[in-house]
Amino acid sequence: VCHSMAHKLGAYHHLPHGVANALLICHVMRFNAAEVPAKMGTFSQYQYPHTLERYAECAHFCGVCGKDDAETLELFIQKIEQLKEAVGIKKTIKDYGVDEQYFLETLDQMVEDAFDDQCTGCNPRYPLLSEIKEMYLKAYYGE
């Protein structure tokens, strides 16, 4: 869903695709890691939520370890945020000069378009429209 949302963020607000993905990735990782998602992904290999476990495995490969998978994920996200800062990625969509009024005017259509994007169906957790909207708002304003 990160890629789907980044497609629309770039299309509506002219942000480079890599920047759009970077602005969204940590919000999407937290969303995907929910142990009790509202709706699972559509592919059969996702019989139960295991995204948190997979993120923790990725973190371990990068030398990041916490006392459990949830702490490991948060430490991993901190490392990703540090990397983003080191390469000059700003903290929020707003920091890139995206006008707040225009962002809010386009938000509902971006949400719908991201939901319908071909990449969304591959996400391990299938998002509700309200959940996509919440992630966009977090990425715009910061948490």
Feature annotation, model-predicted:
Residues 5, 25-29, 80, 84, ...:
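Short alpha-helical scaffolding segments that buttress acidic/His motifs in well-ordered protein cores
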Residues 1-21, 116-122:
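Glycine-rich phosphate/pyrophosphate-binding beta-alpha loops
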Residues 1, 5, 20-24, 54, ...:
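Residue-level detector of well-ordered alpha-helical segments, enriched
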Residues 15, 19-102:
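Gly/Pro-rich interdomain helix-loop hinge
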Residues 102-143:
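Short, amphipathic C-terminal "tail helix"
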Residues 4-5, 71, 94-97, 124-130:
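Short coil/turn segments at secondary-structure boundaries
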